[in-house]
Amino acid sequence: LIGYSTEFLSMTRGYGIMNHTFDQYLPLIPGEIGGRRRGALVSIDTGKATTYSIMSIEERGTIFVNPGTEVYEGMIIGENSRENDLTVNITKAKQMTNVRSATKDQTAVIKTPRILTLEESLEFLNDDEYMEVTPESIRLRKQILDKNQRAKAAKKKKSAE
């Protein structure tokens, strides 16, 4: 049941009650337990996360960072709604112009980010990811930070199989 409690609470939106009783130990069946079914949203750039870029990324999945958070290349900033990992630019700022209009600059409303606890972060990790724990924060990142090097390593791993 390790890793299932978070998924259960998400499915029931916090209203579920879960009880369990130990029955017996059984041998592990490969592929039966764990694993994340969705990919990660990975930052492509280093800098501060902006509200402008978070608004466009929200459509693609769940965000883990607040606006203004320092991010770096290879850092996992959210969970993709699909199975593959998606590299996104969360540091992109809005272009400023001299032309202003009343309807153009609307108030930006974004969803509250999902802040992962230590246990949730451990559940989220895949084989190619690391977790950094500091007194201030818990960050998830890819083992290989550079996007191009990650792609080369994935091709090499695929050809070796």
For the regions a protein language model found, what residue spans apply to each?
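Accessory interaction regions appended to the cores of large information-processing enzymes
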Residues: L1-E161
